[in-house]
Regions:
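Conserved, structured core segments of small domains
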Residues: 1-77
């Protein structure tokens, strides 16, 4: 089953996003074939302000568990 994970960054958190980006990308790469699509949302200033991640998982609970392990989530972004 496919699940879309929609993430809105907290206000004024661009630097946290940039500092955590390499770990986030490594995490996504580690999902292998389970990752179907991922990309940032851009604000009116063309700077990232959130993310969309589409993954394949066996259940909603499994998808939530995967989302909770994302470095962006762990950093409180």
């Amino acid at each position: 089953m496919l699940f879309a994970i929609l993430c809105d960054d907290k206000p004024d958190s661009l630097q946290l996003r940039l500092d955590t980006r390499a770990d986030h990308l490594a995490f996504l790469h580690g999902l292998g074939d389970g990752l179907k699509f991922a990309g940032p949302f851009l604000g009116p200033d063309d700077k990232p302000c959130g993310s969309l991640v589409v993954i394949e998982a066996d259940s909603l609970e499994a998808a939530k568990a995967t989302a909770a392990k994302d470095p962006y989530a762990l950093a409180g972004l």
